[in-house]
């Protein structure tokens, strides 16, 4: 063998990863790489780059879970090569999926299914779940209008301040979005303004059970009752879809007396994120329909796939089964008792933060993390007319220097002059961690007080997460 080749081969085998030739070059970013490299070197390059990401546990902007126990990691690893859509090849994974649908339907008080299987599906997240719920609303409305001999070219959807997925739905499926705007003193959809926006072309009303801007619940029952009166007055029957991305896995455990789900007859479908307060890893959502009549069969496809026949009503197709299996693990592991304990712990942290932050500045609280008002979030603004010598953007920027990602942002609609700060409390953000946040909060306030000339420059660099 050529001596140079032998030397190169020996080096490739024996060099440490930090002595390897490949690690002394800049990782390719614009062209497909020409040559291979050792697996440990490729891993080291990527692993090192990921250190530049923020610390997920300190991300108090996200609604998504940032802590999973080791058994979830094991189950995800076991399922990484199982395709969720291949029901025939992975029948037990498919059975677990159906069990989860039944469990979620039971949690949300869906009527007992005629054939023993609840109507619903797992999704990649609550956004896909919203899309599916919206599609079913449009199809049901169109069928009613066609039966009455009326035009179907101008559908509209009525909602309050919603997550961007509903704007996408409206654009993709050619539906007019009648979003009731936020305004000072009225940050949610109220019955009066909702009714003013409704007509016979309204495919449905979508309350958000856990508004992303503030964390408060947009309570469905008053809206539902107003729609009952609207039907009595006009004869127009309007369905509801509940976007319970966050609240769907909270209220059943910590505020069961809130009537928001299928106990309301107009509620035909509900969507939620498994990977938010459902405690599943990222990539899990759920949508449940009241019954088979609520899901138009035109949306259900029976397709041949790798030798099998499956019925599917999802937008995404191939994806790993691990998220569903991990969700089932959480359901089995915790049950109602365990979920109640975990969610109550998050609310206790939120209440503690709200009480302590109230002592530190001239703040007006929009959400204090109480189970009867919303999700475990703390949202506040500076009191009108008060000038503490800093903005919430300044405070957000200072906290970020310590690794805390706490968003400051303006509200939407007619309330864009209101700047708020929002802190999300989730599993894994325990009381001791909250105390560390408060220490850094106080240190940030002291710095801003000592350096007034540096204030006011943070707004352009601040981030939001709504």
Swiss-Prot record:
Catalysed reaction, written as an equation: L-glutamate + H(+) = 4-aminobutanoate + CO2
Residues with the N6-(pyridoxal phosphate)lysine modification: 276
Gene3D superfamilies attached to this UniProt entry: 3.90.1150.160, 4.10.280.50, Type I PLP-dependent aspartate aminotransferase-like (Major domain) (3.40.640.10)
Record's subunit section: Homohexamer.
Origin organism lineage: Bacteria, Pseudomonadati, Pseudomonadota, Gammaproteobacteria, Enterobacterales
This enzyme's EC code(s): 4.1.1.15
Pfam family, one: Pyridoxal_deC
Organism of this sequence: Escherichia coli O157:H7
Protein name as catalogued: Glutamate decarboxylase alpha
